[in-house]
Regions:
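Contiguous segments within soluble domain cores/interaction surfaces
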Residues: 452-516, 524-530, 600-609
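Flexible helix-coil transition and linker loops at the boundaries of alpha-helical arrays
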Residues: 589-606, 643-661, 694-702
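Low-complexity, acidic Ser/Thr/Pro/Gly-rich terminal tails and inter-domain linkers that flank the onset
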Residues: 414-439
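Short beta-strand elements
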Residues: 166-178, 537-568
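N-terminal prosegments of processed precursors
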Residues: 2-142
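Compositionally biased low-complexity segments at domain edges in trafficked proteins
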Residues: 552-602
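The catalytic-center signature of Zn2+-dependent metalloproteases
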Residues: 311-398
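Propeptide-to-catalytic entry region of secreted or membrane-anchored zinc metalloproteases
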Residues: 50, 68, 86-292, 310-334, ...
């Protein structure tokens, strides 16, 4: 009777009329996490069993740890005064260090005498050449309401027992994660969503779903902490638009569990809009965490954000025509970005099993190839697909855990070697840039996409790696290959569609100087760079660009290189600005510009550009006052912005610039904006005149050239008044 009372708690999940007489047939599932963590165990195994329950993948995986005992008793040999070093200071203590992870991809399953035996060959992620180790796991089968039993796990090498474990079951899930969410005043935490909203699959169960349930359904025990509401006491408008630099600093300052180490804690933030500095209506989500390559730096994938106003503003027929449907898109977008924090790529960007027709969170509804945006929602089951489940549940710990590696997939040599054949297609991709740089100089890539056909062609004007349509692959001087991974990843709507006439091109300028792994070109030698527009399976590829990084430079240049690779300086230059915590960096950069202006104009003008963008915009930070977290705004400094931007442009008096044409055009436009706000029409006129002279022969900046001509006419009207 006691068990039947417990069974009644499952009403709605089980047919009680059918099962109350068959309760003795119900066995507890064996999938979940098992771990030995007793103090006497020197070797610790965290074992994940995934063979039954919800969407089983028939896989075993594990993480191995080692417990070390440290005894500081040797300090007694120094006869220290007891007052300085009392005996209690010499008590031994232990530390636990992670060692490696493994996976068993083919599992043999058998059950006898109510014990299930699981066995298979082990593959270590960090050493796949090891092929002679196997594991045997035995798990007693117990009734549904009985406590979960311990399992035994034995690892064999070449058939000889190597290690044995007795593992208590610690969770029904495969990972345990804590998500902390902050939101800006006026936005909302993701709402519970009715899964039956039209359109949706006909066979979905009735009820609602939220962020925690999405990930628990995927086997991840997600705890959601809806934490702080960020207030703006200064203005009803200032906090609406957030740059990536502001988001990153918000994470560092406001994430309660922020730390420079691997952890199963992650930070999400909801703001109205993204923009740097102008609002981008098609920019819905971002994973903005900067990568770490030096001690003390932020580790990867600890923070993400969504822009609620922008997401809710999406329009597509009747798909988002009421609040409930807009809530659905917000939740899907939020879970998509959290998926990126787990290191999940887009469904169509995987190096293995890529699938643009996946009805997973990691697809874009508007990129769904099996029925378009409406078809996506008709098929969407609020699930990750099997490849993604395997990754989150069983991927290499360092690849999945927040603060860990940035995954780049399989062998990349095919993406940087010679073109396999001449491409036939309507679009051509070209890249260009300096072929010789010194270690402290920035590496700027000019990208051009051209319609080479005789008919008009539709293309997306997304030529920045952060937007994840353009991908860059680099062959290193030692022959190894890597994919360039920008510190920021953006989730963008399918806007910016351009209709290219025959022979027409779109252009952009890409700064490759810094990646998630640090300086992209940190070693002297020859590199080869190639770009892809699309994905690895179906992409327009560019030719290969040779780049040589000089190995001959002076001590003074080496000092400059060391400074520019410092973590705080690198962050400031990538984001082109920062809050008050970067005041020291700003001062150092100003001094560097003054010192090297004549001898190193190439780098100085890039530094002046970053300083100019920094001075030109307001910057939001969060201050804790009492129990409230209030937004504080550091106002722009337009006069300093004009000075820095003028220097970056070679000054408005005719001095030469070293900036590429596109970067020059964008910087000139920003300088004009600042001058107009300040009412400095004389500098504005000189800037527009120089921009017209500089850009008149550049096809890539034709639109900018025409814009400057119009603006110059308007400025001259102002100066005559």
């Amino acid at each position: 009777m006691e068990n039947l009372k417990k069974l009644e708690l499952l009403e709605g999940l089980l047919d009680l009329d059918r099962f109350q007489h068959l309760e003795f047939l119900l066995y507890r599932r064996i999938s979940g996490t098992y771990k030995n963590n007793k103090t006497h165990s020197s070797s610790i195994l965290e074992l994940r069993v995934d063979v039954d329950g919800r969407r089983p993948q028939r896989i075993l995986s594990g993480d191995l740890f080692r417990r070390f005992t440290i005894d500081l008793g040797f300090w007694h040999n120094f006869n220290l005064d007891a007052a300085i070093a009392p005996a209690s200071h010499f008590s031994p203590f232990t530390i636990v260090l992670y060692q490696r992870s493994f996976i068993v991809e083919t599992v043999d399953i058998s059950t006898s005498n109510e014990v299930t035996t699981l066995s298979g060959a082990i593959r270590y992620y960090d050493d796949p050449a090891v092929n002679d180790e196997t594991i045997v796991v035995e798990i007693p089968r117990v009734r549904f309401f009985q406590p979960a039993p311990e399992c035994s796990a034995k690892i064999y090498k070449a058939g000889i027992l190597k290690s044995a474990y007795c593992l208590p079951k610690i969770s029904e899930y495969f990972r345990s994660v804590h998500l902390e969410i902050d939101r800006y005043e006026g936005t909302s935490f993701p709402e519970d969503v009715d899964m039956g909203l039209d359109p949706s699959p006909d066979d979905l169960p009735a009820g609602t779903i939220d962020t925690a349930r999405v990930f628990r359904n995927a086997g991840i025990d997600l705890t959601v902490q809806e934490d702080d509401v960020l207030n703006d006491p200064d203005s009803p408008d200032v906090g609406n638009n957030w740059s990536e630099a502001e988001l990153h600093q918000l994470m560092e300052d406001n994430f309660d569990r922020f730390g420079n180490y691997l952890q199963w804690n992650v930070y999400g933030v909801i703001v109205p809009r993204f923009g740097d500095p102008n609002y981008n209506a098609g920019y819905y989500g971002t994973m903005f965490d900067w990568g770490g390559w030096q001690a003390g730096d932020t580790f990867l994938r600890q923070g993400f954000a969504i822009a609620e106003d922008a997401t809710r503003a999406r329009s597509s027929g009747s798909l988002y025509n009421n609040d409930a449907k807009r809530d659905r898109l917000v939740l899907q977008t939020f879970c998509h970005e959290l998926g990126h924090a787990f290191n999940l790529p887009h469904a169509w960007q995987r190096s293995v099993d890529d699938n643009p027709a996946s009805n997973s969170f990691m697809n874009y509804p508007w990129r769904y190839t099996d029925g378009g945006e409406s078809g996506f929602w008709e098929d969407f089951r609020w699930e990750f697909d099997d490849s993604e489940l395997v990754w989150m549940r069983h991927g290499n710990r360092r690849d999945v855990i927040f603060g860990g590696n940035d995954w780049i997939g399989n062998n990349l040599s095919i993406f940087t070697g010679p073109m396999p054949e001449v491409q036939e297609g309507p679009l051509a991709l070209q890249i260009d840039g300096n072929e010789f740089v010194r270690p402290f100089e920035p590496v700027i890539l000019q990208v051009k996409l051209t319609n080479t056909s005789a008919q008009n062609q539709i293309a997306l004007d997304r030529l920045q790696p952060e937007d994840q349509l353009l991908q860059i692959y680099i062959e290193q001087p030692d022959g190894s290959h890597r994919r360039y991974m920008p510190p920021v990843k953006r989730l963008l709507a399918p806007g910016d569609v351009v209709n290219l006439a025959p022979g027409e091109s779109i252009y952009d300028s890409v700064n490759l100087t810094y990646s998630t792994a640090g300086p992209t070109f940190s070693e002297p030698g020859e590199y080869r760079i190639r770009a892809y527009y699309g994905n690895e399976e179906a992409a327009v590829m560019s030719g290969s660009l040779r780049l040589r990084v000089s190995s001959h430079y002076s001590l003074e240049e080496e000092k400059l290189t060391h400074f520019l690779r410092r973590v705080d300086v690198a962050k400031f230059l990538y984001y082109r600005g920062g809050g008050p915590k970067y005041d020291g960096v700003v001062q150092e950069l100003e001094e560097i510009c003054g010192k090297y202006e004549k001898n190193q104009p190439e780098i100085v003008q890039q530094l002046q550009l970053a300083l100019g963008v920094h001075y030109a915009r307001d910057f939001k930070t969060v201050k804790v006052i009492g129990k409230k977290r209030l937004i504080s705004v550091v106002k722009a400094e337009p006069k300093k912005a004009i000075k820095a931007l003028s220097g970056a442009l070679g000054s408005a008096k005719g001095k030469a610039t070293t900036l590429d044409a596109l970067t020059f055009a964008k910087a000139s436009g920003l300088l004009l904006d600042v001058c107009e706000k300040l009412g400095d029409w004389k500098t504005a006129e000189l800037t527009a005149e120089k921009a017209i002279r500089q850009l008149q022969d550049h096809e890539s900046t034709k639109a900018h050239f025409n814009s400057f001509k119009k603006r110059l006419t308007q400025i001259r009207k102002k100066t005559k008044k």
